[in-house]
A protein has these predicted regions:
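Acidic, surface-exposed loops and disordered segments
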Residues: 1-218
Length: 218
């Protein structure tokens, strides 16, 4: 049996082991991730560790994308110098709350994502790369779809490690590209403040559609 088959079997064993330990999240976990989770505008002074930020990425990278591509790129803004570079790029209404966050993640989409195809999809090392080069009009849709999908996983991973997220679009993205992604094919998607949210800054939750308004059984 070759090494690929061994890896396949190990992957199957891991799934079976996980299912033997847990079949669904309990209500406490659902509260943390969904029901009581909010987008925060204010932050406590607690620090966020490097290990927490690494764990966030290590969780989101496991989630599915098209053909296992990985367009997401992340700049974790923490230092005074980096925040000073970010501040004028933010829309004025968002500056104070963003600068107050212990960490601000700039989430970008790498339009050269397909150059890593041989590593991420070794079973078809040139498949996606050839497709993108032959059909360049597909690059932006693929990068934006999968990068945004990974950015959504990012928010859930932030919550999963016990932190809070404050995602927002309110910045000059072209200026952010020049400031933080110069010399690359990365385009800014949005930013997300990360830290321990101050509950006193939260407003009432806005309405959501009910199941029957957006879903249908066929």
């Amino acid at each position: 049996m070759d090494s690929k088959d061994d890896l396949d079997l190990k992957a199957q064993e891991l799934i079976n082991e996980a299912r033997s330990r847990v079949t669904e999240l309990d209500e406490t976990a659902k509260l943390l991730l969904f029901k009581a989770a909010r987008s925060f505008n204010g932050w406590k002074k607690n620090t966020v560790s490097d290990d927490q930020l690494r764990e966030i990425y290590d969780l989101l990278k496991l989630c599915p994308t098209s053909a296992n591509v990985c367009p997401i790129r992340i700049k974790f803004i923490r230092s005074k110098t980096a925040k000073e570079l970010l501040q004028p790029i933010l829309f004025e209404a968002n500056r104070a709350k963003t600068m107050d966050a212990p960490v601000v993640a700039i989430l970008g989409n790498d339009y050269a994502f397909f150059e890593h195809n041989s590593f991420l999809a070794p079973h078809k090392p040139q498949g996606i790369a050839d497709r993108m080069r032959e059909n360049p009009q597909l690059v932006a849709p693929w990068a934006n779809l999968n990068g945004t999908l990974q950015a959504a996983y990012f928010i859930m991973a932030v919550r999963a490690v016990g932190l809070d997220a404050g995602p927002m679009q309110g910045l000059d993205k072209e200026a952010a590209d020049r400031a933080f992604w110069e010399g690359t094919e990365v385009k800014t998607n949005f930013i997300c403040s990360v830290g321990y949210g101050d509950e006193t800054t939260v407003f009432k939750k806005l309405p959501r559609f009910e199941f029957d308004q957006v879903c249908e059984f066929l």
